[in-house]
Amino acid sequence: ARKHVQELLKTFRRIDFDETRKSVYLQSAKFGVQSQLREPLTKKVLNYWDDVKLSKTCLDRMVTKVNDVKETFYAGFSYACESHNQYSVDCLEAAKPSYLTALGEIRGETEKCLTTRLK
């Protein structure tokens, strides 16, 4: 189980957070990934036996989708925010629910394709 957690955490390190972006956005984006994906998936793989292999294709797809969703979240916080001042906490709060929902959907998809049994 420990090797599964290590593999999963290594995968999460591949998610690209642009550190030049505003800290309020970065904190929110990272917390979303942690709470909606990393913690639930880590708890799940802790229960796996050693004869279970994590699907690299599935994990790669998760990283790609998370990076896409983060960009949409950033757009909602910045240039696509029309109802409030761009880069404001109001824009961030307006964009956050759809970001968290999208991460939850990615978690569901990832849970379905996460494992393959070793023969």
UniProtKB/Swiss-Prot annotation:
GO terms for cellular component: extracellular region. The activity is increased in the presence of host properdin (CFP). Disulfide bonds join 58-113, 81-91. One of its GO terms (molecular function) is toxin activity. InterPro entries: ALL3/gSG7_salivary-like_helix (IPR056799). Keywords: Complement system impairing toxin, Disulfide bond, Secreted, Toxin. It is found in: Secreted. Salivary protein that inhibits the alternative pathway of complement system activation in the host while having no inhibitory effect on the classical pathway. Inhibits activity of activated host C3-convertase complex C3bBb (C3-CFB). Enhances accumulation of C3bBb on immobilized properdin. This is gSG7 salivary protein. It comes from Anopheles freeborni (Western malaria mosquito). The lineage of its organism: Eukaryota, Metazoa, Ecdysozoa, Arthropoda, Hexapoda.
